């Protein structure tokens, strides 16, 4: 009779719920064996569910594949709402039918998994472009226009250049066919890939700024208006990376000028 350890090793090789190996092993009454069978079945079901989820997020890409297009870039941005730091956009071209386990809208990925999935995108993408527009430009042109500039910069870095753009809720004035998708980072794997690249890139930048400008908790809040950030603004004032067109930074700058 096989040991439970041997059965556990055998079960790792089983990839289908209908496998005859399960039927054979289920005759073994040992509780340890039954526990390992249940565990392996749950793992297989989880893999099937994940594959279905990833398939559903390729629906836009597959429609474009049918048209003979393969160089499809997903575009997304991070950092529209913060009081400090740049807006960062990423453009990512994934290989045809590429599925990266765990890839999703970056807001839905556990923080501890960000770097792992970011690295998987880096490893598998055909091309990645990143656009970074700083707070000074944001203050000059407004955040919406700055976001478009960041996206255009990211796209310009792609090589090869894309045949079609899938963009999260935006249209760009570019001579490339494009589809604007509401909640694109949750509905397109290409956009989700851009989402995690932009997110990790910006988070790392804000960690660097945290070293330069201590007291605002940038490493944790990424420039968003948390209690610690607002406390830092009140005590220490405005830094060179703050967006002076955003409240309450704007009022602090005006108050300083008037005093």
UniProtKB/Swiss-Prot annotation:
<dbReference type="GO" id="GO:0005737">
    <property type="term" value="C:cytoplasm"/>
</dbReference>
<comment type="similarity">
    <text>Belongs to the RNase HII family.</text>
</comment>
<dbReference type="InterPro" id="IPR024567">
    <property type="entry name" value="RNase_HII/HIII_dom"/>
</dbReference>
<keyword id="KW-0963">Cytoplasm</keyword>
<feature type="binding site">
    <location>
        <position position="168"/>
    </location>
    <ligand>
        <name>a divalent metal cation</name>
    </ligand>
</feature>
<feature type="binding site">
    <location>
        <position position="77"/>
    </location>
    <ligand>
        <name>a divalent metal cation</name>
    </ligand>
</feature>
<protein>
    <recommendedName>
        <fullName>Ribonuclease HII</fullName>
        <ecNumber>3.1.26.4</ecNumber>
    </recommendedName>
</protein>
<feature type="binding site">
    <location>
        <position position="76"/>
    </location>
    <ligand>
        <name>a divalent metal cation</name>
    </ligand>
</feature>
<dbReference type="InterPro" id="IPR012337">
    <property type="entry name" value="RNaseH-like_sf"/>
</dbReference>
<keyword id="KW-0255">Endonuclease</keyword>
<dbReference type="GO" id="GO:0032299">
    <property type="term" value="C:ribonuclease H2 complex"/>
</dbReference>
<keyword id="KW-0378">Hydrolase</keyword>
<dbReference type="Pfam" id="PF01351">
    <property type="entry name" value="RNase_HII"/>
</dbReference>
<dbReference type="InterPro" id="IPR022898">
    <property type="entry name" value="RNase_HII"/>
</dbReference>
<dbReference type="GO" id="GO:0004523">
    <property type="term" value="F:RNA-DNA hybrid ribonuclease activity"/>
</dbReference>
<dbReference type="GO" id="GO:0003723">
    <property type="term" value="F:RNA binding"/>
</dbReference>
<dbReference type="GO" id="GO:0043137">
    <property type="term" value="P:DNA replication, removal of RNA primer"/>
</dbReference>
<keyword id="KW-0540">Nuclease</keyword>
<keyword id="KW-0479">Metal-binding</keyword>
<dbReference type="InterPro" id="IPR036397">
    <property type="entry name" value="RNaseH_sf"/>
</dbReference>
<dbReference type="GO" id="GO:0030145">
    <property type="term" value="F:manganese ion binding"/>
</dbReference>
<feature type="domain" description="RNase H type-2">
    <location>
        <begin position="70"/>
        <end position="258"/>
    </location>
</feature>
<dbReference type="GO" id="GO:0006298">
    <property type="term" value="P:mismatch repair"/>
</dbReference>
<keyword id="KW-0464">Manganese</keyword>
<comment type="function">
    <text>Endonuclease that specifically degrades the RNA of RNA-DNA hybrids.</text>
</comment>
<dbReference type="InterPro" id="IPR001352">
    <property type="entry name" value="RNase_HII/HIII"/>
</dbReference>
